[in-house]
């Protein structure tokens, strides 16, 4: 974590500023599954299932296309890089910045302005949703109720997905606020304005490409291309609030009122 602050007077006893910034260089662990390096590898070692092969391998009368070969084919045929599929971590940096300006206009009027912006993101695995149809209909070799649904989705332990299937969920929040405090005789008034903007888009590696699931024996073998629910999935919320509050004193009586919209 890195941070710095700076503040002081621009005009003595009149105008002041303060700024602060923080940065975190976060790293998030990637998927733990690894591919099989050869036909003699066990299907499960230390709780990790080794389903796909690193390179194209023949087992008995079947040939399994390797993850490296799929990546090479996509690169040569479509100029598309599906990304890594094992042994990687993801950088998810975050930062915060804040600034404030205070202005003592005169003895009866003071105003301040505040600005804050935060940015963070985290990496998420692709959606594990599968077809609502019976397993034997959509999954080659599948048996109803055994291999499909959650047990054979993109995040199941029987397959591996490429990095392009992951997505980054960003979280951006910006706030601008101002407050004007004034006094006229027995009347005190506070006028506040706040604007906030929440922006949470999704991003992904590899560029635009169809979502592709390769199935085998009733379950997913590998997946590449953007998560099917990521493109166009965003949240944007803008909020404006204006508040005015006044206080009037007369003898032992105190009257308060205000509006907000």
Specify the residue positions occupied by each region the protein language model found.
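Transmembrane beta-barrel wall of Gram-negative outer-membrane proteins
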Residues: 1-124, 168-195
